[in-house]
């Protein structure tokens, strides 16, 4: 279907440019029966495995190989000392690119994550990347390494710094190859929203085969933010492939939308969800046509809608992209790379996953604040992928002043600067 509702053929070939398409399409939806007992036994086994790996991750420093750290508070700090004990830092300090530890001292395993703020608690959902990293034969041409699917994890925190592991809330299925959550498949970029009408927590997740030819959007729901989530089914929204995704709930209307990388990643689709957030109304639109983007995130600031995403280069980082609009449906005005300074052309060696509103206050004069969350992928050892969290600032740039298109001219653009460490309670300084 086109944005006007008229059927159209997929303009992208099934076998497109491999570098631009880290994901591919497979047609069979499969039997979505859920084997609870065996899946949860598998989850417990994996949790025990995390404990055995803790010492290795806690003491080994790897982040200095991908970024030259610049200290903002101690000029003589060793560049290689990236595993500084938490008691040496302020309780509200975030160190991008370091190993984030949970309250038990274990490395946090929640990649490609999404966040939910509910009843004064933050919840972090993400992909568990553990075990051997390997490249299936079908993925060798574009470097599509992977680990077997374990499930979706959940952590909770009162302050964005101290995270408690709450379990594997959507585990993989080990004994049914036709299931969407089969452990040899893919479940990526989980995003969870709360539906006040149904009092349910709804998770959307990119479902795929290991060669990324399936390209579907899966949905699950729970009565609790810490699960367990019951898997419902997967879709091909608008009868098109759907890869990287995000879910956005409009603050003004509480209408929810699924935003997906579609048509072999050449176009983003915005699809309106039903009132229970688990299906589609049939209203949708194509945006960013021909721009080949993935890792989308959408957020509101005032009366404007902002988009941040990435280009398509597999696990390798590239320059982030941003855009602004007065409507979720567009038109969208691109604002360029929000990252500034050294390593901006690689998004500080990372890829966007979420923008989280974190309330008002701090040194920015009480305005609403936003956290840019990204993943620093390690394609040779995905379990050692790191997290890059940085504050977003807003400023009118020269490009904004020159922009004539609706939705862009004169509006403030999101700006992200690298900081080795920052205080989540009071981090916003002048650009």
Protein language model features and the residues they cover:
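N-terminal targeting leaders characterized by basic, low-complexity, disordered sequences
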Residues: 1-14
């Amino acid at each position: 279907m086109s944005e006007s509702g008229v059927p159209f053929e997929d303009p992208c070939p099934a076998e497109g440019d491999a570098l631009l398409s880290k994901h591919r399409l497979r047609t069979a939806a499969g039997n979505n029966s859920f084997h609870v007992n065996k899946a949860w036994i598998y989850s417990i086994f994996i949790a025990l495995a995390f404990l055995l790996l803790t010492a290795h991750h806690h003491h080994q420093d790897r982040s200095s190989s991908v970024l030259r750290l610049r200290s903002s508070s101690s000029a003589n700090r060793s560049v290689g000392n990236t595993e500084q004990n938490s008691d040496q830092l302020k309780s509200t300090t975030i160190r991008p690119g370091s190993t984030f530890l949970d309250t038990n001292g274990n490395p946090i395993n929640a990649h490609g994550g999404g966040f939910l703020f509910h009843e004064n608690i933050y919840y972090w959902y993400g992909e568990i990347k553990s075990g051997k990293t390997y490249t299936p034969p079908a993925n060798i041409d574009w470097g599509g390494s992977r680990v077997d699917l374990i499930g979706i994890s959940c952590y909770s925190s009162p302050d964005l710094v101290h995270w408690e592991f709450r379990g594997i809330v959507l585990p993989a299925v080990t004994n049914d190859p036709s299931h969407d959550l089969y452990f040899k498949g893919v479940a990526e970029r989980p995003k969870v929203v709360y539906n006040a009408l149904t009092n349910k927590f709804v998770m959307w997740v990119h479902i795929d085969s290991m060669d990324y030819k399936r390209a579907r959007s899966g949905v699950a729901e729970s009565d609790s933010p810490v699960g367990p989530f019951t898997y419902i089914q997967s879709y091909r929204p608008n009868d098109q492939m759907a890869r990287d995704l995000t879910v956005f709930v409009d603050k003004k209307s509480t209408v929810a939308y699924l935003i997906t990388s579609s048509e072999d990643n050449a176009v983003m689709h915005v699809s309106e969800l039903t009132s229970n957030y688990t299906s589609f109304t049939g209203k949708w639109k194509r945006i960013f046509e021909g721009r080949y983007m993935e890792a989308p995130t959408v957020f509101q600031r005032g009366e404007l809608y902002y988009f941040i995403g990435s280009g398509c280069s597999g696990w390798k980082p590239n320059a982030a992209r941003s855009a602004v609009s007065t409507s979720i449906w567009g038109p969208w005005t691109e604002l360029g790379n929000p990252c500034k300074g050294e390593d901006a052309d690689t998004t500080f060696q990372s890829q966007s996953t979420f923008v989280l509103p974190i309330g008002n206050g701090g040194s920015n004069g009480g305005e609403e604040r936003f956290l840019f969350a990204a993943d620093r992928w390690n394609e040779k050892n995905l379990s050692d992928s790191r997290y890059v969290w940085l504050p977003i600032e807003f400023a009118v740039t020269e490009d904004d002043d020159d922009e004539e298109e609706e939705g862009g001219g004169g509006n403030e653009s999101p700006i992200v600067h690298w900081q080795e460490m920052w205080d989540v309670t009071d981090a916003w300084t002048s650009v």
